[in-house]
């Protein structure tokens, strides 16, 4: 299951049941606002979804086959007053050939970041969202994240000394950093305006402009999850319990 929660508590989710997919949209009291039953023919298999911060927009990425080619579609649904006169609340959509969009993130009330297997795209609009920025990468993208107006991509590196490469962009598509990484990471996330790379026992922290702040061992067992608590404090969920660390 994949789910997205808007600021006021409404929830949208992709549900799977007996090999079939459903997209459900629920109010704060649990009542159903909308429901759809997409399939591979129309509009495709739902890969991910994201609600706008005000809950009026839902962005959904689909994958489908057309003429023997795999395609993807990014669709935007309006559940405000403007969407009442639209067929199935669909305001706009964009289709792409030979690429998939496994992840889509909301960047406010009228902006979205869609991650593809070859890069990312930015969509903007209050009536009919459309693509405004397109960034493509030649290398293999291993991980991606968005928060605080920053798009972070981890690509496979070109040497054993630097197995990964991190690129940071703003929402205009401007590249802010391109760093070779010697840290063997397993997870990427953005917390408290910091880029966090973790593996079993280690943490590596970068600023949103690509400056390394810390790299070292923070757990004697195994890190399951890490949460930013503000003021350079992080809560570690470890194999044997929970601990708090503070970085100088």
Please report, for each region that a protein language model flagged, where it lies by residue:
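Intrinsically disordered, low-complexity segments enriched in Gly and acidic/Ser/Thr residues
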Residues: 130-222
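Structural motif
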Residues: 19-25, 66-77, 117-124, 160-167, ...
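Recurrent small/Gly-Pro-centered beta-turn motifs in extracellular repeat architectures
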Residues: 13-16, 60-64, 115-116, 154-157, ...
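Short loop/turn segments that connect beta-strands within beta-propeller blades
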Residues: 27-30, 78-82, 124-128, 169-172, ...
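Hydrophobic beta-strand positions that form the internal "hydrophobic ladder"
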Residues: 10-12, 56-58, 111-113, 151-152, ...
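A short beta-strand motif characteristic of beta-propeller blades
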Residues: 1, 31-40, 83-95, 128-135, ...
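Repeated scaffold domains used in trafficking and secretory/extracellular systems
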Residues: 1-8, 41-52, 90-105, 135-149, ...
């Amino acid at each position: 299951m994949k789910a997205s929660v808007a600021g006021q508590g409404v929830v949208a989710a992709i549900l799977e049941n007996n090999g079939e997919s459903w997209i459900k949209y629920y109010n704060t009291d649990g009542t159903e606002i909308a429901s759809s039953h997409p399939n591979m023919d129309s509009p495709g298999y739902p890969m991910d979804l994201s609600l706008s911060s005000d809950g009026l927009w839902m962005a959904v990425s689909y994958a489908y086959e057309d003429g023997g080619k795999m395609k993807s579609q990014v669709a935007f649904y309006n559940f405000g007053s403007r969407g009442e006169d639209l067929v199935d609340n669909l305001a706009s959509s964009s289709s792409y050939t030979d690429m998939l969009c496994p992840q889509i993130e909301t960047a406010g009330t009228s902006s979205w970041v869609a991650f593809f297997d070859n890069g990312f795209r930015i969509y903007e609009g209050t009536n009919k969202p459309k693509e405004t920025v397109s960034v493509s990468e030649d290398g293999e993208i291993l991980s991606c994240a968005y928060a605080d107006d920053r798009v972070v991509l981890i690509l496979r590196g070109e040497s054993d000394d630097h197995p990964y490469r991190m690129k940071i962009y703003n929402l205009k598509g401007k590249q802010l950093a391109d760093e070779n990484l010697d840290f063997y990471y397993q997870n990427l996330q953005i917390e408290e305006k910091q880029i966090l790379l973790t593996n079993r026992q280690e943490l590596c922290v970068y600023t949103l402009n690509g400056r390394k702040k810390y790299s070292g061992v923070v757990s004697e067992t195994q890190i399951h999850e890490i949460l930013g608590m503000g003021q350079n404090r992080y809560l570690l969920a470890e194999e044997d319990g929970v601990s708090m660390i503070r970085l100088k």
